[in-house]
């Protein structure tokens, strides 16, 4: 099942539990999810996909005019009623030599399936 969207919600630390997750490399992304990412990568996106007892959460930042970008996963957490993911796009350092081709930074994380709404921060 593939889902997309986002919601803003105030999360308090007292009901928040950090979850174990894995950042998935390109060859580990399920084919159906990768296909949708390829279709949507030129615009910012958030989506989730579940298969075989795992949940994949994807966050993309749209087209960037150069290379040199990376994404940091700051937190993946669970509350009483939601899952959450917080990511940060990190741009190239000042003066860093970068590829002058358009790039489409995104990250996919994998965790055990939990049936809750996902909050993207």
Name these PLM-found stretches.
Residues 4-121:
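Exposed, flexible binding/inhibitory loops of compact, secreted disulfide-stabilized domains
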């Amino acid at each position: 099942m593939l889902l997309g969207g986002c919601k803003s919600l105030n999360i308090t630390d007292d009901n928040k539990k950090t979850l174990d997750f894995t950042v998935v490399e390109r060859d580990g992304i399920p084919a159906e999810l990768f296909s949708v990412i390829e279709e949507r990568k030129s615009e910012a996106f958030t989506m989730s996909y579940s298969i075989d007892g795992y949940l994949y959460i994807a966050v993309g930042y749209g087209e960037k005019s150069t290379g040199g970008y990376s994404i940091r996963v700051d937190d993946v957490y669970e509350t009483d009623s939601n899952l959450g993911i917080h990511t940060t796009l990190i741009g190239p350092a000042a003066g860093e030599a970068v590829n002058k081709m358009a790039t489409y930074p995104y990250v996919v994380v994998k965790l055990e399936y939990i049936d809750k709404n996902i909050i993207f921060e």
